[in-house]
């Protein structure tokens, strides 16, 4: 089953206001209308000047279906919190696969056929060796037949400070196409949260990246 990599937003916690209140804890957390009006400027100043700890109070939470190669890119961000579908603990019965959209048609077909063969060997091996090795070890060993384009599901969350780090590295022209697409999907989902709770945080990131801060 060929599928595109996809991202769902499971939830979020916090907002620009929560981040601002965290910063104001050092003086007074009491919110007035006057202080609320200062939140956009405060958020921008905090990010511009490198006071990033308050941004850890905002959290975004995603469900990601992606190829194993992209999953490895997610794993490299140790500042995220991640749990994923495991071929060690379960048989991957659905045989979900990703085929690069920019492949020539000939190589799309070849990769799909190669993946079908590998998936068939995975299931055959698992069934054949579990009597000798036991179900647990059989699942561990048979998964070596799975290819890099096999898809698994991951539950991943970031605080807003670590999410920025992820976007800087993965929503980049230097990143691999697939993980860049995942990063862009994540950012778009955060931008589309009802009420735009992180509006000024995202704007502060953009300003600093473009050197628009005075």
For the regions a language model picked out, list residue spans one by one.
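Family-specific signature for flavin-dependent thymidylate synthase
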Residues: 1-214
């Amino acid at each position: 089953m060929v599928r595109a990599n996809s991202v769902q937003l499971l939830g979020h916690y916090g907002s620009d206001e929560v981040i601002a209140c965290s910063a104001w804890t050092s003086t007074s957390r009491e919110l007035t209308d006057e202080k609320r009006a200062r939140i956009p400027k405060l958020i921008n100043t905090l990010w511009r000047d490198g006071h990033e700890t308050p941004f850890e109070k905002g959290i975004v939470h995603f469900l990601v279906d992606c190829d194993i190669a992209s999953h490895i890119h997610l794993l490299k961000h140790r500042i995220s919190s991640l749990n994923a579908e495991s071929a060690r603990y379960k048989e991957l019965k659905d045989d979900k696969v990703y085929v690069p959209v920019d492949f020539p048609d000939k190589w799309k077909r070849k990769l799909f056929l190669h993946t079908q063969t590998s998936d068939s060997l995975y299931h055959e091996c698992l069934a054949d060796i579990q009597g000798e090795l036991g179900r647990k070890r059989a699942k561990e060993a048979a998964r070596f037949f799975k290819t890099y384009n096999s898809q698994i599901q991951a539950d991943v969350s970031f605080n807003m400070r670590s999410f920025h780090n992820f976007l800087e590295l993965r929503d980049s022209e230097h990143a691999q196409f697939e993980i860049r697409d995942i990063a862009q999907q994540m950012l778009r989902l955060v931008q589309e949260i009802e009420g735009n709770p992180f509006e000024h945080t995202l704007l502060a990131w953009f300003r600093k990246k473009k050197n628009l801060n005075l």
